[in-house]
């Protein structure tokens, strides 16, 4: 058989459309989508013929059932949502590639109400006048953090950009070289800072920065001092850094705002739950930081957002910055964030109901109970395999608490019928 004979075996679009399975498909999917899938599959077979050698053409065959199945699957793949629910079996709690923090089930009803109806997003129900979308969040954030004011944008990088564009545009911002982190995907804090301010003044070295380094970087053009919490890595050993309190004591910096990018945004002192202490938003403000920025979807356990808290005089300027309009959050994020924040009014409720906090503070006893439930489900599959429970370690993830190792339990499964395990 020659290649031209193989090409002749390829069915026409019309002949495929007459297939009963394809007719059934037309009842549930758009015709144009099915036609596209038919053409894609036929073209794939055509390319397959082109690639094979002449002496292999004899073995080439087109099985109609397989062809139809490919068309059906291709159509379904095109129609289904690209973003899908997955099981996180990585051992990383806040996995950036898997969507970071899970929202609490308590947030679900709030989201449904707001998503499927109208809302008072920018309407004041008390006076019947236009309101601000930020009013829904400012009071609860002020209560939880002790900040004078707050504004929310769509992520923490946007928060840093807005802060610097408002406070330090056309001026200089001092930052330690040891705090110029890369936040993932080749995005560096230095690049974001340069977009927002006129000039970045790097001081000190990677492992050591002294107060004199900050003083040497100070000039008449200095508009702010930036502190970046290195939440996604630690430099250990021969190191030194300058704390907020020491910076606040310097006469030169008396009228210079200190900005701190906390990144992960912790509201609870996790050392009370047997974990390493991680600086909280409240602690930073108590130390005298003028502006703090942090993420909503990391340790806070809410939706993606960049939260800015601090002195009212600076926050008011940010709210008037034209960038705020470009970076603003929508009603869905506001609803999810408010519902998440309200759980923090009772710390025990937050630990119990916010999935991220619940997972990282979970005791070994609780894990063992969950492991027992999982084992029962595995055994129900009647897998002919050896199953062994072992202790293991996981991580917080999301650029948070890089040195913290969380004890967990895993099942090792090996031998026969491993295909069934995929259904767990």
Predicted stretch roles:
Residues 43, 89-90, 101-126:
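Glycine-rich phosphate-binding segment of PLP-dependent enzymes
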Residues 82-87, 191, 294-297, 348, ...:
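Short, flexible, solvent-exposed loop/turn segments with mixed acidic/basic and small polar residues
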Residues 368-424:
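Conserved C-terminal alpha-helix-loop-beta "cap" of PLP-dependent enzymes
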Residues 57-103, 110:
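Long amphipathic N-terminal alpha/beta scaffold segment
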Residues 1-76:
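Long amphipathic alpha-helical segments
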Residues 80, 128-344:
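Conserved PLP-enzyme active-site core in the AAT-like
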Residues 54-58, 83-84, 236, 255-256, ...:
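Flexible, glycine/charged-enriched surface loops at secondary-structure junctions
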Residues 313, 321, 329-378, 393, ...:
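Structural motif of enzymes handling amino- and sulfur-group chemistry
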């Amino acid at each position: 058989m020659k290649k031209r004979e193989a090409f002749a075996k390829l069915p026409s679009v019309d002949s495929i459309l007459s297939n009963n399975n394809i007719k059934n498909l037309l009842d549930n999917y758009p015709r144009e989508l099915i036609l596209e899938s038919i053409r894609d599959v036929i073209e794939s077979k055509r390319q397959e013929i082109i690639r094979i050698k002449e002496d292999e053409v004899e073995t080439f065959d087109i099985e109609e059932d397989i062809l139809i199945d490919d068309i059906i699957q291709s159509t379904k793949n095109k129609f289904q949502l690209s973003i899908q629910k997955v099981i996180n079996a990585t051992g990383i709690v806040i996995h950036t590639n898997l969507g970071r923090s899970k929202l609490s089930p308590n947030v679900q009803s709030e989201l449904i109400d707001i998503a499927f109806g109208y809302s008072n997003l920018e309407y004041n129900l008390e006076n019947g006048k236009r309101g601000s979308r930020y009013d829904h969040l400012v009071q609860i954030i002020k209560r939880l953090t002790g900040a004078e004011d707050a504004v929310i944008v769509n992520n923490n990088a946007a928060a840093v950009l807005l802060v610097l564009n408002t406070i330090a545009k056309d001026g200089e911002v001092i930052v330690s070289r040891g705090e110029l982190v890369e936040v993932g995907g080749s995005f560096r804090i230095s690049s974001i800072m340069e977009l927002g301010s006129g000039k970045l003044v790097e001081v000190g070295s990677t492992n050591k920065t002294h107060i004199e380094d900050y003083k040497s970087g100070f000039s008449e053009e200095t508009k702010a001092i930036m502190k970046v919490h290195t939440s996604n890595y630690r430099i250990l050993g021969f190191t030194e850094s300058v704390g907020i309190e020491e910076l606040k004591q310097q006469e030169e910096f008396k009228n210079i705002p200190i900005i701190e990018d906390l990144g992960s945004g912790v509201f609870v002192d996790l050392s009370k739950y047997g974990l390493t202490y991680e600086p909280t938003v409240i602690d930073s403000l108590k130390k005298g930081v003028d502006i703090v920025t942090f993420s909503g979807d990391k340790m806070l356990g809410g939706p993606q957002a960049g939260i800015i808290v601090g002195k009212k005089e600076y926050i008011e300027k940010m709210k008037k910055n034209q960038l705020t309009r470009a970076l603003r959050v929508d009603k869905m994020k506001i609803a999810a964030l408010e519902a998440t924040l309200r759980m923090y009014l009772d710390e025990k409720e937050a630990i119990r109901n916010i999935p991220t906090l619940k997972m990282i503070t979970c005791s070994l006893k609780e894990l063992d109970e969950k492991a027992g439930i999982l084992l029962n489900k595995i055994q129900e599959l009647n897998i002919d395999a050896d199953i062994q429970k072992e202790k293991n370690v996981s991580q917080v993830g999301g650029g948070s608490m890089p040195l913290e190792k969380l004890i967990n339990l895993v099942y090792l499964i090996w031998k026969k019928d491993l295909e069934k395990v995929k259904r767990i």
